[in-house]
Amino acid sequence: MMDAAAESVMSSVRERFPLLGRQVNGRPLVYLDSAATAQKPEAVIEAEVSYYRNSNANVHRGLHTLGDEATRLYEGCRDRVAGMLGVAADQVTIQR
């Protein structure tokens, strides 16, 4: 059994993931198949929707505006992740 503080933290984390708000068989959904796919928090879903609506193009390939925008977004993401991890950007690999 979790104490009240731990339960509050878990609840606040779960609230960030829209799918985890579902009930299955009358109980809160618990998703344990993370080897197959990971659930996304609302912030990630919103960022992906914005990307697909506004900047969707191949990175490092196009010699056009959308390709340049997509490449800047991609490399900006790599730079931010590297900063959070305290490593060089070329050490960060982004997988689909």
Predicted regions and their residues:
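Pyridoxal 5′-phosphate
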Residues: 1-96
